[in-house]
């Protein structure tokens, strides 16, 4: 029985899941928006949001924890230099999942997962306001 077992298996073994979410988290931090399946996006939230919360208080210990979870120095730098200060006043809820239809090959439900308040969002809102 699966009682009290949280998280999705996604038909992968644990090392594959860990590597996949490590790579997806790095991609999301680097590009601030990625396209994936809805199930992976929902599970990715559980990986990325604690990383951003960790980045809100910059210390050597927190940087080492973030590096242990991402294994990418560039991503750790962006987390602590850009994302931590950006979300300093926000108490969680750093990601947004937008469903975007079905994948062509297998009809899997797809979604964009993005960081809220990213600079492109602000530019798009300003463009919409000026058009009206």
Swiss-Prot record:
Q: How does it assemble?
A: Part of the 50S ribosomal subunit. Contacts protein L32.
Q: What is this protein called?
A: Large ribosomal subunit protein bL17
Organism taxonomic ancestry: Bacteria, Pseudomonadati, Pseudomonadota, Gammaproteobacteria, Alteromonadales
- State the similarity comment: Belongs to the bacterial ribosomal protein bL17 family.
| An annotated GO cellular component | cytosolic large ribosomal subunit
* Keyword set includes Ligase: no
Q: Name one GO molecular function term.
A: structural constituent of ribosome
Keyword tags: Ribonucleoprotein, Ribosomal protein
